[in-house]
Amino acid sequence: MNKKQLNFEKSLKKLEEIVSEIENADPDLDKALALFAEGAELIKSCLAKLNETKKKIEVIISSGKTEFFKE
């Protein structure tokens, strides 16, 4: 599965599935390591997306283009 094709929500869902499989399926060491590596890549991807989104929000707020409360 190509992690770059997954959006943030699908990546989180996949991470939940990986954690569940490691906790409940009792995989052998090689399978557990592969799942761990896949999860680490998904985490990296999610963090990058969160940081990118945070920067966009900061730009919007600092530009004054957004009013949070209109009276």
From Swiss-Prot:
Its main location: cytoplasm. It catalyses: Exonucleolytic cleavage in either 5'- to 3'- or 3'- to 5'-direction to yield nucleoside 5'-phosphates. Keywords: Cytoplasm, Exonuclease, Hydrolase, Nuclease. GO terms for molecular function: exodeoxyribonuclease VII activity. It is found in: Cytoplasm. It is an enzyme of class 3 (hydrolase). One of its GO terms (biological process) is DNA catabolic process. Its EC number is 3.1.11.6. GO terms for cellular component: cytosol; exodeoxyribonuclease VII complex. Bidirectionally degrades single-stranded DNA into large acid-insoluble oligonucleotides, which are then degraded further into small acid-soluble oligonucleotides. Belongs to the XseB family. Heterooligomer composed of large and small subunits. This is Exodeoxyribonuclease 7 small subunit. It comes from Endomicrobium trichonymphae. The lineage of its organism: Bacteria, Pseudomonadati, Elusimicrobiota, Endomicrobiia, Endomicrobiales.
